[in-house]
Amino acid sequence: MIIKEKIEMKSLKRERDIIIYVPDDYLTSKKRYPVLFINDGQNAFFDEEAYIGKSWGFLESIKKLQIDVILVAIYCNFEPLKREDEYGPWVMSQDLSQEFQSNRLVGGEGKAYVHFLTTELKPYIDQRFPTKIDDYGIVGSSMGALISFYAFLRYPTIIKKCAILSSAFWIYEQEFVNLLKVTAISHNMLYMDVGGQEDDERYVSSNEHIKKCVEGKLKDFQYRYFPEGKHSEYHWSQRVPIFLRMFYGGK
């Protein structure tokens, strides 16, 4: 079952479109389901709504793997540079902000965004659906991966699974290194990958650096390098079954 609606983001004083997928028999199955938040949720399910006309194909993947999970896809902010603001945990330097062709400093709303996810959206989902309240995960790519990883590190007792694809770590590399030093995630699960044909060589170098910082901090950690992987929804969609199987099993 697919449910589309708008939800108020009190933490950011705006509204946002979300799409919720729940198993068709959720009212009668007497099951409780894990939940996966999907950033850039407009790309999660439908090609006609996705960037460049290619979705990540989550519905096809969970059906093929026979996974029972609730998916909550949160659309990004489509206003100029607001996606970068919301998915940016810290304010970027002037030089980095200029790379986004901005005459102002970019980022810094990420803390409020993950506060919305954990203290507004999660209780809303838990109240409406039969969830496993202690089994939440999050996924994102590029800057959506940054905010996913930030949520995973800031709220490790709430967000216990995280998949980050082609993370733009070069934007906040040292900030994440510092945050990793003071965060306990040993009992959580992390999937991380990067492609060899990303838009900028800094993707690979920064992901390799963060990988080294992560290693040893948690047992359930998987890092993959795809030599032919590009920075696109098509390539990310090919990797969805990998982290879904890691998190939830399936065929």
Language model region names:
Residues M1-K251:
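Non-catalytic cap/lid and distal C-terminal segments of serine-dependent acyl enzymes
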